[in-house]
C-alpha cells in the first residue's frame, strides 16, 4: 500500500489541474506561452500519475479497471469484477 501522503499529493495535483484547466486551454490557444509558464507546475496534466483506486499502488496499473494487477488478480479470482472470468482454451 502506498503512503497516505503520496495518495494525498496525487489528489492535490488532480485538484490543481482541474482548477487551471480552462485557463491553460485558453492560454495555449492564444499562444501566450509566457503566461502559461507562470502557472503552477502542478497545473499541468502531465504531472498526474495514475494510481490504484484501492490502495494507491503506482505501478502495474490497468487503466480499464482502475487498479493494479495485484488487486485485479485478487478480485478476479474471487469473482468480484463483473464480466471477468478465468481463461481456458
From Swiss-Prot:
Example of a GO cellular component annotation carried by this entry: cytoplasm
SUPFAM superfamilies reported in the protein's UniProt record: Glucocorticoid receptor-like (DNA-binding domain)
InterPro entries assigned to the protein according to its UniProt record, in alphabetical order: Ribosomal_uS14 (IPR001209), Ribosomal_uS14_bac/plastid (IPR023036), Ribosomal_uS14_sf (IPR043140)
A GO BP annotation: translation
Domain of life from the UniProt record: Bacteria
Gene Ontology terms, MF aspect: rRNA binding; structural constituent of ribosome
Keywords from the named record: Ribonucleoprotein, Ribosomal protein, RNA-binding, rRNA-binding
Subunit structure: Part of the 30S ribosomal subunit. Contacts proteins S3 and S10.
Entry function: Binds 16S rRNA, required for the assembly of 30S particles and may also be responsible for determining the conformation of the 16S rRNA at the A site.
Stored NCBIfam families: PRK08881.1
Sequence similarity: Belongs to the universal ribosomal protein uS14 family.
Name of the protein in its database record: Small ribosomal subunit protein uS14A
Organism: Lactiplantibacillus plantarum (strain ATCC BAA-793 / NCIMB 8826 / WCFS1)
Lineage: Bacteria, Bacillati, Bacillota, Bacilli, Lactobacillales
